[in-house]
Regions:
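Conserved hydrophobic/aromatic pocket- or pore-lining residues that grip, position, or stack substrates
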Residues: 30, 53, 75, 81, ...
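Extracellular/periplasmic catalytic domains that process cell-envelope and extracellular macromolecules
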Residues: 70-73, 114, 164, 250
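Enzymes and membrane/adaptor proteins characterized by extended Gly/Ser/Thr/Asp/Glu-rich
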Residues: 72-109
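Short glycine/serine-rich loop segments
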Residues: 105-230
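Amidase signature
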Residues: 1-68, 232-314
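Short, conserved beta-strand segments within well-ordered enzyme catalytic domains
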Residues: 44-45, 72-73, 77-79, 119, ...
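Short, well-ordered beta-strand elements within core beta-sheets of diverse protein domains
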Residues: 12-18, 98-102, 214-221
């Protein structure tokens, strides 16, 4: 079999469920890689003990032996972004200001991850309070890029991106207010998906003003894994969804606004706009209506608006 930590999340799921590899073997493989890389990369924080990790994996194996699977993530290790609550783990927001007592319950999307069988082994590092395009804080220090330790990991989901790009984890959750999933994913050659506002439920205290600036999303090394995790995170009662389409599989009638590079104001790497154009054509083929947009105000005004809203949301 291909080295366990090189498998995609969906490949791991298949291997675990057809019993070609055990949950304990999977956990041991990822723990070995974490023990080797994380002391330098510093992507994962508040890790539970190795003994506790292996005990969870052993229980997952026993459940499978009894014919019981919690879901497609059964036995797959994952860590939660340290802005969100995972029962029993401290939620520090990367700041010495916040208590390190274990959370009393999972946040809604974390409960979905756990409910699908994932084994939560710790947290992923963030800039303090999740504010910043690079990941470092006074509590845990600097997170390095998983592809090149001399480069920035990006932020604020930098710990998650590094854990995934370095194969310490197969996939991760994250959140994005203005690039916090997409930036670290771009910096590290993986896929980061910012879901539409409200598509994935968040704890009420995550957005007390109800501005909807932050969206939860998924990270992985390929689109298929991101899609699978996104589907799991969206699998909630309709009453909890703000997004009008939820996890619908078709795009007929959906309007998509496209700004492109805002008439040259936003520099793009070579090939990016052409790739986006191909994606727009695919979306149009699935029934979406593409509206080419222009900003009715200056880029400077847009930036000032963003800063004002972010400050208010804090």
């Amino acid at each position: 079999m291909t080295q366990i930590t090189r498998l995609t999340a969906l490949q791991l799921s298949e291997a675990i469920h057809n019993r070609s590899v055990s949950c304990v073997e999977v956990m041991n493989a990822f723990l070995e890689r974490i023990n080797t890389l994380n002391p330098d990369l510093n992507a994962l924080v508040n890790l539970i003990t190795q003994e506790a990790c292996l005990a969870m994996a052993g229980e997952s194996d026993r459940q499978l032996s009894s014919g019981n699977s919690a879901g497609w993530l059964h036995g797959i290790p994952i860590a939660i972004k340290d802005l969100f609550n995972a029962k029993g783990l401290a939620t520090t927001l990367g700041s010495p200001m916040f208590p390190e007592a274990g959370a009393q319950q999972d946040d809604p999307h974390v409960a979905r991850i756990r409910g699908a069988g994932a084994l939560i082994i710790g947290k992923t590092n963030v800039p303090e309070a999740g504010l910043g395009g690079h990941t470092r804080n006074a509590l845990f220090g600097l997170t390095r890029n998983g592809l090149d330790r001399n480069l920035s990991a990006g932020g604020s989901s930098g710990g998650a991106a590094t854990a995934v790009s370095s194969h310490m984890l197969p996939l991760a959750d994250g959140s994005d207010m203005m690039g916090s999933l997409r930036t670290p994913a771009a910096f590290q050659g993986i896929v980061g998906f910012r879901a539409s506002a409200g598509a994935i439920p968040a704890a009420t205290d995550a957005d007390p003003q109800g501005l909807g600036l932050t969206s939860i999303g998924a990270m992985a090394r390929n689109v298929s894994d991101v899609s699978a995790l996104f589907t799991t995170l969206c699998d909630v009662p309709a009453a909890h969804r703000q997004s009008p389409r939820g996890s619908s599989g078709h795009l007929k009638g959906l309007r998509i606004g496209w700004l492109g590079n805002a008439d040259g104001h936003w520099p793009m790497a070579k090939g990016v706009l052409a790739q986006c154009q191909r994606a727009l054509e695919n979306l149009q083929g699935l029934g979406a209506q593409i509206d080419l947009c222009t900003l009715p105000f200056s880029i400077a005004d847009l930036w000032f608006c963003w800063l004002t809203l972010r400050q208010h949301s804090m």
